[in-house]
Amino acid sequence: LFDMKKRVGILTSGGDCPGLNATIRGVAKALYARFGENVEIVGILNGYHGLITGEYKEMCEDDFRGILTLGGTILGTKRTPFKLMRVVEEDKIDKVAAMKKTYKDAKLDCLLCLGGNGTHKTANLLSQEGLNVIGLPKTIDNDIYGTDVTFGFHTAVDIATEVIDRNHTTAGSHSRVM
């Protein structure tokens, strides 16, 4: 499939959730297993903010070791509201043009975007601009259209259930409602 070296960018956007690093690792392992030395992975730092400002780094297989159970995201993330993507603010930066420039400067062939609704709206916008984009659904809200369950959701439910169970026990011990 890859007859010449391809460069794949990965970014995480929005809030962090359980499973981000595991997903990043899984994607990297799958790419290396399938394409070996014919793939290069580029980490976009701090979500779309990094794509706007040109913050990215070349990654190697060692970068993905030891992150399976690590919380957060090794790439960093920032909330960059979708509604502001087309707005040229006082800094006079055309964000869409800046993201396209970084994509081209990094010589990306494809960009994988891990995030929720806003992340996927921006990914769709970039796709409409002619960039090759793949969206990976990530949200503890489990509210992305077309998905049954998003990663991060089950862990959030498990933690919330545990907190409620513990408070229930405490409330019973003190004969009160919490």
Question: Predicted segments — roles?
Answer:
Residues 168-178:
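Internal, active-site/partner-interface "lid" segment
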Residues 14-18, 114-121:
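Gly/Ser/Thr-rich loops at beta-strand to alpha-helix junctions
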Residues 1-13, 23-107, 118:
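A cross-family phosphate/adenosyl-ligand binding-site feature
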Residues 104, 108-110, 115-119, 127-129, ...:
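Glycine-rich, mobile lid/loop segments that gate access to catalytic sites or pores
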